[in-house]
From Swiss-Prot:
Mn(2+) 1 binds at residues 8, 10, 41, 196. It is found in: Cell inner membrane. It comes from Shewanella amazonensis (strain ATCC BAA-1098 / SB2B). It catalyses: UDP-2-N,3-O-bis[(3R)-3-hydroxytetradecanoyl]-alpha-D-glucosamine + H2O = 2-N,3-O-bis[(3R)-3-hydroxytetradecanoyl]-alpha-D-glucosaminyl 1-phosphate + UMP + 2 H(+). This is UDP-2,3-diacylglucosamine hydrolase. Mn(2+) 2 binds at residues 41, 78, 113, 194. Substrate binds at residues 78-79, 121, 159, 163, 166, 194.
Amino acid sequence: MRTLFIGDLHLSADRPDITSAFRRFLSQSFDDVDALYILGDLFEVWVGDDIAEPFALDIAADIAALSHKLPIYFIHGNRDFLIGKQFAAISKMQLLDEVHQINLYGIPTLLLHGDSLCTLDKGYQRFRWFRNQPWVKWIYSKLSQSKRLSIAANLRAKSKAGNQLKSQYIMDAEPHAVADLLQKHSCRQMIHGHTHRPAIHHESAGTRIVVGDWYSQSSVLEMTAEGPNLQAKPLGGS
């Protein structure tokens, strides 16, 4: 048996190639799969369940169809942190906490999106704290669709411009943050995304596995009792 992990697909109507690759992934055989975990940033942007576009509802239907075969779990990313119970219900995904612990074939394992590990990026962490305040989410939910989309587009533009000025080092998972979180939860293994740097890191605190993004290829982490297997395929298939 195996368990699959994906993340950072950044699905949008503007990238039909990614959407097609995701649908091919969902159409494969899952007979020997225990569960599928989506570790955030399933969508490029999400401004609220109440104004989900037809594209997103089609994706929800695709995911729901697979849910009849196996459980599907979702952890919020920094792009789709506003996905709520309404969308989870129609897509048949089970929402998990920001940091979730599972027993993965005998190994206590932490699952998370990964942006909380980039602690050297002080500016982003301040924004992240502000963004997660319940009152901020409440005010945002009361805005019109056009206003929410405008704010989201502005934030993405600022983030892209700001990231070009930051070193790759501060935008990666900080080793002490990784070690502290593993120690806090008494785990020796962690799986996350966000950084778009797929790799298997064997560190003193434990094993850290990073799932890749889907911008130029599909990226799937397969976990079995024998260990991890990071898989990548061209978006066009084959």
